[in-house]
From Swiss-Prot:
Name the record gives this protein: ATP synthase subunit b
Source organism (scientific name): Paraburkholderia phymatum (strain DSM 17167 / CIP 108236 / LMG 21445 / STM815) (Burkholderia phymatum)
Primary localization class, coarse: membrane
Localization in the cell: Cell inner membrane
PANTHER family assigned to the protein according to its UniProt record, in alphabetical order: ATP SYNTHASE SUBUNIT B, ATP SYNTHASE SUBUNIT B', CHLOROPLASTIC
Subunit structure, as described in the record: F-type ATPases have 2 components, F(1) - the catalytic core - and F(0) - the membrane proton channel. F(1) has five subunits: alpha(3), beta(3), gamma(1), delta(1), epsilon(1). F(0) has three main subunits: a(1), b(2) and c(10-14). The alpha and beta chains form an alternating ring which encloses part of the gamma chain. F(1) is attached to F(0) by a central stalk formed by the gamma and epsilon chains, while a peripheral stalk is formed by the delta and b chains.
Disulfide pairings: none
Function: F(1)F(0) ATP synthase produces ATP from ADP in the presence of a proton or sodium gradient. F-type ATPases consist of two structural domains, F(1) containing the extramembraneous catalytic core and F(0) containing the membrane proton channel, linked together by a central stalk and a peripheral stalk. During catalysis, ATP synthesis in the catalytic domain of F(1) is coupled via a rotary mechanism of the central stalk subunits to proton translocation. Component of the F(0) channel, it forms part of the peripheral stalk, linking F(1) to F(0).
Length: 156
Protein backbone atom coordinates (compact mmCIF):
# COMPACT_ATOMS: atom_id res chain seq x y z
CA UNK A 1 0.00 0.00 0.00
CA UNK A 2 1.20 3.24 -0.96
CA UNK A 3 0.77 6.03 1.56
CA UNK A 4 1.26 9.35 0.04
CA UNK A 5 0.58 12.92 1.00
CA UNK A 6 -2.95 13.06 -0.42
CA UNK A 7 -3.97 10.29 1.86
CA UNK A 8 -2.57 12.17 4.81
CA UNK A 9 -4.19 15.36 3.59
CA UNK A 10 -7.52 13.57 3.25
CA UNK A 11 -7.09 12.18 6.75
CA UNK A 12 -6.31 15.64 8.09
CA UNK A 13 -9.30 17.12 6.22
CA UNK A 14 -11.50 14.28 7.51
CA UNK A 15 -10.31 14.85 11.08
CA UNK A 16 -10.89 18.62 10.74
CA UNK A 17 -14.34 17.91 9.31
CA UNK A 18 -15.07 15.46 12.14
CA UNK A 19 -13.83 17.98 14.71
CA UNK A 20 -15.85 20.80 13.08
CA UNK A 21 -18.94 18.60 12.94
CA UNK A 22 -18.51 17.53 16.58
CA UNK A 23 -17.89 21.08 17.70
CA UNK A 24 -20.40 23.10 15.69
CA UNK A 25 -22.91 20.85 13.88
CA UNK A 26 -23.42 18.00 16.36
CA UNK A 27 -24.53 20.04 19.46
CA UNK A 28 -27.45 21.81 17.67
CA UNK A 29 -28.55 18.44 16.23
CA UNK A 30 -28.36 16.81 19.68
CA UNK A 31 -30.20 19.81 21.18
CA UNK A 32 -32.91 19.57 18.50
CA UNK A 33 -33.25 15.82 19.11
CA UNK A 34 -33.32 16.35 22.88
CA UNK A 35 -35.97 19.08 22.52
CA UNK A 36 -37.99 16.84 20.21
CA UNK A 37 -37.78 13.90 22.62
CA UNK A 38 -38.66 16.22 25.50
CA UNK A 39 -41.70 17.51 23.58
CA UNK A 40 -42.73 13.94 22.82
CA UNK A 41 -42.26 12.94 26.46
CA UNK A 42 -44.22 16.02 27.60
CA UNK A 43 -46.95 15.19 25.10
CA UNK A 44 -47.09 11.59 26.32
CA UNK A 45 -47.20 12.68 29.95
CA UNK A 46 -49.89 15.24 29.11
CA UNK A 47 -51.83 12.53 27.29
CA UNK A 48 -51.45 10.22 30.30
CA UNK A 49 -52.47 13.04 32.62
CA UNK A 50 -55.48 13.79 30.39
CA UNK A 51 -56.38 10.11 30.39
CA UNK A 52 -56.20 10.02 34.20
CA UNK A 53 -58.26 13.22 34.42
CA UNK A 54 -60.80 11.73 32.02
CA UNK A 55 -61.04 8.58 34.14
CA UNK A 56 -61.41 10.73 37.26
CA UNK A 57 -64.09 12.79 35.51
CA UNK A 58 -65.90 9.58 34.52
CA UNK A 59 -65.72 8.39 38.13
CA UNK A 60 -67.07 11.74 39.37
CA UNK A 61 -69.85 11.63 36.79
CA UNK A 62 -70.71 8.06 37.81
CA UNK A 63 -70.70 9.07 41.48
CA UNK A 64 -72.86 12.12 40.81
CA UNK A 65 -75.27 10.05 38.72
CA UNK A 66 -75.41 7.44 41.46
CA UNK A 67 -75.96 10.15 44.05
CA UNK A 68 -78.65 11.75 41.89
CA UNK A 69 -80.36 8.36 41.47
CA UNK A 70 -80.18 7.77 45.21
CA UNK A 71 -81.57 11.23 45.92
CA UNK A 72 -84.33 10.63 43.37
CA UNK A 73 -85.19 7.29 44.95
CA UNK A 74 -85.11 8.91 48.39
CA UNK A 75 -87.42 11.68 47.19
CA UNK A 76 -89.76 9.11 45.67
CA UNK A 77 -89.73 7.12 48.92
CA UNK A 78 -90.39 10.30 50.92
CA UNK A 79 -93.22 11.26 48.59
CA UNK A 80 -94.71 7.78 48.93
CA UNK A 81 -94.44 8.03 52.72
CA UNK A 82 -96.11 11.44 52.66
CA UNK A 83 -98.82 10.10 50.35
CA UNK A 84 -99.44 7.15 52.66
CA UNK A 85 -99.52 9.48 55.67
CA UNK A 86 -101.95 11.83 53.92
CA UNK A 87 -104.09 8.87 52.84
CA UNK A 88 -104.09 7.51 56.40
CA UNK A 89 -104.99 10.94 57.74
CA UNK A 90 -107.81 11.26 55.21
CA UNK A 91 -109.02 7.77 56.12
CA UNK A 92 -108.94 8.65 59.81
CA UNK A 93 -110.84 11.86 59.15
CA UNK A 94 -113.36 9.98 57.02
CA UNK A 95 -113.80 7.34 59.72
CA UNK A 96 -114.23 10.02 62.37
CA UNK A 97 -116.75 11.83 60.16
CA UNK A 98 -118.58 8.54 59.51
CA UNK A 99 -118.64 7.79 63.25
CA UNK A 100 -119.94 11.29 63.93
CA UNK A 101 -122.63 10.93 61.27
CA UNK A 102 -123.60 7.50 62.61
CA UNK A 103 -123.75 8.84 66.17
CA UNK A 104 -125.84 11.79 65.00
CA UNK A 105 -128.15 9.44 63.09
CA UNK A 106 -128.49 7.19 66.15
CA UNK A 107 -129.23 10.21 68.34
CA UNK A 108 -131.81 11.45 65.83
CA UNK A 109 -133.36 7.97 65.65
CA UNK A 110 -133.47 7.71 69.45
CA UNK A 111 -135.05 11.15 69.66
CA UNK A 112 -137.64 10.20 67.05
CA UNK A 113 -138.33 6.95 68.93
CA UNK A 114 -138.90 8.92 72.15
CA UNK A 115 -141.20 11.35 70.33
CA UNK A 116 -143.08 8.46 68.73
CA UNK A 117 -143.47 6.72 72.10
CA UNK A 118 -144.76 9.93 73.68
CA UNK A 119 -147.18 10.40 70.82
CA UNK A 120 -148.29 6.78 71.11
CA UNK A 121 -148.75 7.14 74.87
CA UNK A 122 -150.91 10.17 74.32
CA UNK A 123 -152.93 8.41 71.64
CA UNK A 124 -153.23 5.24 73.75
CA UNK A 125 -154.39 7.31 76.73
CA UNK A 126 -156.91 9.15 74.58
CA UNK A 127 -158.11 5.89 73.07
CA UNK A 128 -158.33 4.30 76.53
CA UNK A 129 -160.38 7.22 77.84
CA UNK A 130 -162.57 7.17 74.77
CA UNK A 131 -162.97 3.40 74.99
CA UNK A 132 -163.76 3.60 78.70
CA UNK A 133 -166.23 6.34 77.99
CA UNK A 134 -167.94 4.29 75.34
CA UNK A 135 -167.91 1.21 77.58
CA UNK A 136 -169.37 3.22 80.44
CA UNK A 137 -172.06 4.67 78.20
CA UNK A 138 -173.13 1.25 77.03
CA UNK A 139 -172.93 -0.72 80.23
CA UNK A 140 -174.10 1.79 82.75
CA UNK A 141 -177.58 3.10 82.42
CA UNK A 142 -179.40 5.90 84.27
CA UNK A 143 -180.84 3.66 86.97
CA UNK A 144 -177.42 2.18 87.74
CA UNK A 145 -175.99 5.70 87.92
CA UNK A 146 -178.65 6.84 90.27
CA UNK A 147 -178.11 3.84 92.50
CA UNK A 148 -174.32 4.46 92.56
CA UNK A 149 -174.85 8.12 93.42
CA UNK A 150 -177.26 7.28 96.20
CA UNK A 151 -174.85 4.76 97.60
CA UNK A 152 -172.03 7.36 97.57
CA UNK A 153 -174.29 9.85 99.41
CA UNK A 154 -175.02 7.30 102.04
CA UNK A 155 -171.37 6.51 102.59
CA UNK A 156 -170.38 10.13 102.94
Amino acid sequence: MNLNATLFAQMVVFLILAWFTMKFVWPPLINALDERSKKIADGLSAAEKGKLELEAAHKRVDQELSQARNEGQQRIADAEKRAVAVADEIKAQAQAEAARIIAQAKADADQQIVKAREALRGEVAALAVKGAEQILKREVDQAAHADLLNQLKAEL
